[in-house]
Amino acid sequence: SLQKPLLIDFNAGALQYRRNHGGKKELLLKAISAKPGQQVIDCTAGLGVDAFLMAASGCTVTLLERSPVLALLLADGLSRGREGPETQSIVARMALVQTDAIEWLGRLEKPADTIYIDQMFPHRQKSAAVKGGMQLLQKFLGDDGHVADLLAAALATNSRRVVVKRPLVGGDSEGMAPHYQLKAKASRFDIYLQNPATH
């Protein structure tokens, strides 16, 4: 069958439903401790879904994406999001940078409130269970084996919180144990804190 064209649409029904009905129940938002005005760096922007939900909760999000193709798709999605009455105030809090996240973090002058890394794609077998946009996303990203280096770079910024989204089963912690975890059906969030005693 023909592959449907991949389009990033922040006005899409499913995403709007999650925005309207997820709220504090959205585990992602609990993991990043989402608050209005909070500065979040999303190191693995991908299709922008997580960044959009963070921005919808009031966070200011910098999206880092190293794939030029995905960055173009994201730029297009953000452009159309600025025209939608439901999404324009949300995407106004989203800034896209096409870059290598490790290099970008190495130049970061001021620690962020939260740095977010999504490790849901590495080492996952090609199967019928990975569909549509996700399949195409894997094609663009390839086998992303640099999560350990990315986590080390994120921790080196001295940001208040680093959150890594991993597969529930088989998601290696790269030898760096998190301070705590939040678990969902198919994934978990490993959370690293700069000052654990204050949380």
Language-model segments: which ranges?
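S-adenosyl-L-methionine
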Residues: S1-V40, A56, T60, L64-T114, T198-H199
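Conserved acidic residues
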Residues: Q38, D113, R160
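Conserved beta-strand/loop positions that form the S-adenosyl-L-methionine
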Residues: C43
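Mobile active-site "lid"/loop adjacent to the S-adenosyl-L-methionine
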Residues: Q119-L150
